[in-house]
């Protein structure tokens, strides 16, 4: 039995990196933008979900960790504390 070729998930175009498109760098003080890249549990979303480039994903992770350290972002959501 052979598998037919057209039965997989449809491929979508790669999403363009928001930071590169806007010409900005992730900043720990921009809490509203950083929250878009966190799950409800407070975890950092992976690149495959956000479409951010590898370079900006590393900078984003550092910015989120800095914001957490300075208590601008919660380390854990309120319902788990």
UniProtKB/Swiss-Prot annotation:
<comment type="similarity">
    <text>Belongs to the bacterial ribosomal protein bS18 family.</text>
</comment>
<dbReference type="GO" id="GO:0070181">
    <property type="term" value="F:small ribosomal subunit rRNA binding"/>
</dbReference>
<protein>
    <recommendedName>
        <fullName>Small ribosomal subunit protein bS18</fullName>
    </recommendedName>
</protein>
<dbReference type="InterPro" id="IPR036870">
    <property type="entry name" value="Ribosomal_bS18_sf"/>
</dbReference>
<dbReference type="Pfam" id="PF01084">
    <property type="entry name" value="Ribosomal_S18"/>
</dbReference>
<comment type="subunit">
    <text>Part of the 30S ribosomal subunit. Forms a tight heterodimer with protein bS6.</text>
</comment>
<keyword id="KW-0687">Ribonucleoprotein</keyword>
<dbReference type="GO" id="GO:0022627">
    <property type="term" value="C:cytosolic small ribosomal subunit"/>
</dbReference>
<keyword id="KW-0694">RNA-binding</keyword>
<keyword id="KW-0699">rRNA-binding</keyword>
<comment type="function">
    <text>Binds as a heterodimer with protein bS6 to the central domain of the 16S rRNA, where it helps stabilize the platform of the 30S subunit.</text>
</comment>
<dbReference type="GO" id="GO:0006412">
    <property type="term" value="P:translation"/>
</dbReference>
<dbReference type="InterPro" id="IPR001648">
    <property type="entry name" value="Ribosomal_bS18"/>
</dbReference>
<keyword id="KW-0689">Ribosomal protein</keyword>
<dbReference type="GO" id="GO:0003735">
    <property type="term" value="F:structural constituent of ribosome"/>
</dbReference>
């Amino acid at each position: 039995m052979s598998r037919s070729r057209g039965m997989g998930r449809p491929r979508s175009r790669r999403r363009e990196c928001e930071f590169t498109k806007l010409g900005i760098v992730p900043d720990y003080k921009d809490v509203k933008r950083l929250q878009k890249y966190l799950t409800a549990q407070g975890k950092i979303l992976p690149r495959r979900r956000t479409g951010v480039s590898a370079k900006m994903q590393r900078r984003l992770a550092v910015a989120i960790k800095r914001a957490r350290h300075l208590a601008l972002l919660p380390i854990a959501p309120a319902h788990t504390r």
